[in-house]
Amino acid sequence: YIYSADADEVLDEENREKFRYLKENLMPEVEIVQMYYGNQLSHRSVYNYDRELRPKLFKRQRSFQWIDPIHETVRLLPVVFDSDIEITHMPQGSHAGRDLAIFEDMVKREESFSKRLFTMYAKELLIAGDREKLACAEDFFTQAADGGQTAPEQMKEALCVVVRAARLRGDDLKMYRYAMKGVTDEGISEVCWELGEYYFMQKDYVEASIWYYNAAYETSSILNIHTGGDLPLMRLSECYEALGEKEQAKEYRSLAKSWT
């Protein structure tokens, strides 16, 4: 088996013992072992959850096996074992600047992005990217949003980045044009959040509250989970506070603080 390690991860004594036991008792048919990765939210990382399973141990050689008694085919999905081993992520600083610089170099060299890397780039921008980094990435994601070959999920992710970048630049027309693409069908929390932010900054608290409500209750987030949870709930509290509706403001403030 091959263990995939990061330079900033730590395995304490208890989990080293669990790992030793796992290696001694691992069944040969297991091809991937997943382990919990903890402390992910430190330093504003790209992740939405502080603890989640990740594939960490991989079988070196994997042979195909025939399955099903009729219409036989080979099994394509690996045999995965979810262990209770927990690795602690202990970065000494934020990696966002480094990661975004690598993505920017890939764009300059016109390298292709896998769906996974495309999603990671969009996540890094929405969770940790500043105004400058968003402006740098705007053309790349605009092309993706306009591209006829872009997969539906990546299209939605591109819209989230373009809408935020355009809003921060003050390009209201572009922001609104791409936002409307993102609120059709089921809608996207990130886009509703950006529209709420636009109207909030204009001090149009009634209109802003509509979009914050949509972000929190009518849509789902795809990149930053907080845009569908505590962020719009807290903004709803601020909107109702500005409108003089104290009880509503108090209720949403409580919901925001208790959101997990």
Regions found by a protein language model. Give the residues of each.
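Short beta-strand-to-loop acidic/aromatic patch adjacent to the donor-nucleotide binding site
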Residues: Y1-E13
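Structural motif corresponding to the intra-repeat A-B loop/turn of tetratricopeptide repeats
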Residues: A128-R131, R169, Q202, L243
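Catalytic-site signature of metal-activated, phosphate-bearing donor transferases
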Residues: L11-E132, C136, F141
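Flexible helix-coil transition and linker loops at the boundaries of alpha-helical arrays
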Residues: V107-S114, A144-M155, T219-H226
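Amphipathic alpha-helical segments of tetratricopeptide repeats
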Residues: T142-D146, V183-T184, A215-S220, K257-S258
